[in-house]
Amino acid sequence: MRIICAIFCFAAGLCLAGPGESSGLVFNDLEGVPRHPLDPAEKVASVLFFYCQDCPISNSYAPEINRICASHTNFAFYIVQVDPDLTPAAAKEHAREYDLHAPVLLDPQHRLVKLAKATVTPEAVVLGKDGQLLYRGRIDDLYAGLGKKRGAVTQHDLRDALDTITAGKKLKPKETKAIGCLIP
C-alpha cells in the first residue's frame, strides 16, 4: 500500500508541478552536461524528439531534425534515445555518424517516454513552460505507413506547430499520428 501511495504522490507531483518545478528530471547529455528537458528556461518551449538508433525511420529524419533545430532557435531541442540497451559510447558514435546537432539524452528507464506518452520513434513532443502538452505527433507526412515512404513531404506538421506556437496562436490539431518504430 505504501508503494502505491508513493507512486501516486510522485505522479501527482509531476502533473501538478508549476513552471520550472517539473524540471526535477535532469539528464546528462552525451558530453556530461546536465540538461533539464522539461524546463525550456528562456526558450518558448521544449521539443523532445523520441528517437531509436536502430529505427530506419528515425535515422532518415536526422537531417530534417537538424534543419528544424537550426530554423527554430527559440525552442529548446532534445533528442531522446529510448533504447534501454544503448550505451553512452554507442549513442555518441551514432550521434556522430548521423551528425545529430541537438543534445542527445539517454532515457533507458523511459521516464520521459512515459511522461510525454510517446509510443513510436521518431515522435515529436512539444511541452510549454508549465509542462503543458502543446503538440505530440509526427514531424511531417513523409511516411504514410511503415514501409510506405512518400516521394515528397506535403505537410510539415511539427514546423507548422512551432510556427503557430511562436505566433501565440491556438494550435489545431494538437496531436497527429506519428509513423515509426514502436518504442522498446
Regions found by a protein language model. Name each.
Residues C5-C15:
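Bacterial N-terminal signal peptides
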Residues C15-G24:
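Boundary at the C-terminal end of the N-terminal hydrophobic targeting segment
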Residues S23, A45, L100-P103, A118-V125, ...:
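Structural micro-motif
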Residues L25-S46:
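A short beta-strand-turn-helix
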Residues P40-N59, L162:
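Short active-site neighborhood of thiol/selenol oxidoreductases, capturing the structured segment around
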Residues C52-P63, P84-D85, A124, C181-P184:
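Short, thiol/selenol-centered motifs that function as redox-active sites or metal-ligating centers
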Residues N59-Y98, L106-L115:
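Structural microenvironment flanking redox-active thiols in thiol-disulfide oxidoreductases
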Residues G128-P184:
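Thiol-/selenol-based redox modules, centered on thioredoxin-like
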